[in-house]
């Protein structure tokens, strides 16, 4: 994941996206909801710290499965390390959801 602020590079972090049989939606989005701690209603109350929801139930969020970052293992969300998820969450809070664009490409 590449993160830019006002057009300047801010960070590059490894992520996990959808595994076979699932999909991470591609496109440009604006976050519509933030949750410091969310629990999945679909996947056994799985913790989703620092969730940034961008389309339906899809979110960018932290994961405890750090060893799997860089691999396609999620149900469609974009997973980050907890520290990076927190940094991104705080950045979106400070910049404002309305000033944040999420672009997901293949």
Residue map of PLM features:
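Hydrophobic residues embedded in beta-strands of well-ordered beta-sheets
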Residues: 1-2, 59
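Glycine-rich catalytic cores of cysteine/serine-nucleophile enzymes that process amide/ester linkages
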Residues: 2-26
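Generic structural detector for well-ordered beta-strands
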Residues: 14-16, 30, 103
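Active-site donor-binding loop signature of nucleotide-sugar glycosyltransferases
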Residues: 15-17, 33, 62
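Exported/periplasmic cell-wall-interacting domains
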Residues: 23-28, 35-106
